[in-house]
Amino acid sequence: VARLSVWTKVFASGRTWIDGPDGYYHLRRAFLTLQRWPRVPLTDSFMSVPSGSRISWPPLFDGLLATLALPWRASAPIASLERIGALLPAILGVLQVALIVILTRLLASHRAALIAGACAAFFPTLVRYTLLGTLDHDPFFECTLLLALIGIAAAPRRGSIAAVTAGITLAILGWAGSIVGVAIVAAFALARAFTSSSETRIEIGRALFLANVIAAGIALPFVMASPWEGATFEGLSWFHETALLGAAAAGAAIAWRDRRVAIGGAIALLGAIALLPISLLPALRGLLYAGGHAPIFAGVAETQPLLFLFGRFDLWPALIRFGFLPLLAVVALRRKAQLPLATWCIVALGLALLHSRFSYTAATPLCIAAGIAVDELLAAHSRIRVAIMSALMIAPTLIAYLPIPGFAAFNFYERTTPILSSAAPGACDFLRSVAAEDPALRNPYVQPAWSVLAPWYHGHWIMWIGQRATVINPMLSVGQPAFDDGMRFFVRAGESNAMEIVQRHHVRYVVVTPDLASLPTQAAMIGSEPPQDLREAMHVLPMHLAYWGASEVRAFGDTYPALPFDEVWRSREVRPGPFGLVPLMRVYRVRSAV
């Protein structure tokens, strides 16, 4: 119910609205997969025109989305993909709660499992990423991670090896960042081995070893076919094989008494060592990337440190996500038996503090720890006392559900879906109508007829709703050769240089927004210097078009030349600017492209 509570926001005006930009590219890739099912494209000419782009996401998640839409492939592929894509996060969210209950039961009592499940069902951080319409790979990854951890916690029970193998394999083929999951599973296994008997320790090590070896073998053909050469964390590559072999060697070290596993572990270790020279630098870059230390993240709020989410120290984002649950978790984590859970919490919370999107990853072990803690407290204190204390611990998280003045951006029902607050739907509908369907819409291997140059965060919307190729998009620089060049168009002063970029990327339409305040942030994303003052900023071609139109303007003792663009669409919505009210969005056609 909590995950479906935004139904009227997602299914509105006869359309399906996905929350956030990345979900729209998941839809496009699934749409491309439907054209040639079961082959999932690894590159796409519709992005980063004219070079095209490598897709950083492994194929499994988008292949799953396409497979679910197969019955409607001939009749209504776009509408069915949108509806399935909107429902899938909520379904995965319910599955995640069930897996949390199972894992908690393996770690503690039946009552602790039910409490952890109840917490997970309503905990805002878990609900936020599994709300109806919040299409992305995150809940899929968390479910695979839980499956692998269930296997480790269940050892030496029957099926534990299969669970770990399935979890790690699905994770690797579903998200390039799943190396984080491999590390968490390995750390969890090492901690559990430390607290277990010698017989159980061998089974844990065997499960970790076999699961990673099998996952490495299954992933190998995909790595060899991947457009990402060498080793990199940005896409499925030899770096992932290195991580899997390293985790397999760690498993063999735990089960060193098993001679066959020890020999296999030695072979895995040699393989990891052989790949280490090409993987060390990607590993360092991956750590910095996971920690949010990359220039391109300057303009992406969810990649900022949790306590500095908006550029200044602020506890509220952390309190709304977690409440005081970390304090409650200490009650459960102080015992040696819960060392595996404590290890998981420390790793996940550390990642969340560095990179706020990992709050979702950290919420799962916190819910489990909270369930165990409340169970222990109920054994020592009255129910009323424990209920009051628990309510106080989660009180800050209620901001996500209740309307509190000043916190609308954190509330599930008051926050605005990004695409609907941007005037992008109208612009996308216009772009879709201006010409016949582009051949590259259904075939990612042919060159698009022309492209649209729009602010990076509009790229996926334009590709899916507008059905037009783009130069830059929310993939940022990952696999996108045109990203830096396209960003320079939006942040650097100089009309002639901007026109060269337009010609270089086969641009026919330009989308502009009056957003002077974002220039420093966008410039930082490519390591560029922003304009120093308003006089210089208005020489940034998109700012000229957004505030003044394409005509010549004399201002600030300077002359701003007329630009070879024709305005073809503008939004009804307006916003105030330094020169009066201006449209929230405008679309221009490049005159030389007529």
List each language-model region with its residue ranges.
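Extracytoplasmic
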Residues: 390-594
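Alpha-helical transmembrane segments at the extracellular/periplasmic loop-to-helix junctions
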Residues: 237-254, 261-342
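Perimembrane helix-loop-helix junctions
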Residues: 181-264, 375-380
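Membrane-embedded helix bundles of polyisoprenyl
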Residues: 2, 88-106, 112-197, 208-226, ...
